[in-house]
Amino acid sequence: MTMQLAAMLSRWEPQRDTDEWILGTVYKTEGSSYRKPGAMSLISSGGEQLGLLSGGCLEADIRLSARKVMASGIPVCIRYDGDDEDDLSYRLGIGCGGVVHVLLEPVNVENNYQGLQDIQRSLANRQSGYLKQHIPAPGTVSLPSHYIVES
């Protein structure tokens, strides 16, 4: 995943201020899923998507939800349930039958780009660290993510 993340961030960095960006993160799964917790994607207002959060079947709905986050500026958590016939992911054919929880949050200068520049720098310098993401409870606002370099 480190190489995928490094490649994604190197493609994002030159464009970070030309479009609005949303960071999508799989933060929890239940049962089987194509991507595991920690999978990330960056979605731009120009329609570009760097990385995937599913096997492809959820991406269109994730991009639609990302546009709503761009408009509101408020992070959201989305739950896709492949076993629930009433859930959108069931109708989309999620395929795995599991549950995927996704956090979508704005990425901009005001929130220090959610720590993504720090991650990119650490990867380039071969330093280890971790990203602390705040998953908002329903009806609450998320705090910005913070990247912490381990020494």
What positions do the PLM features span?
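Segments forming oxygen-rich coordination pockets for charged ligands
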Residues: M1-S151
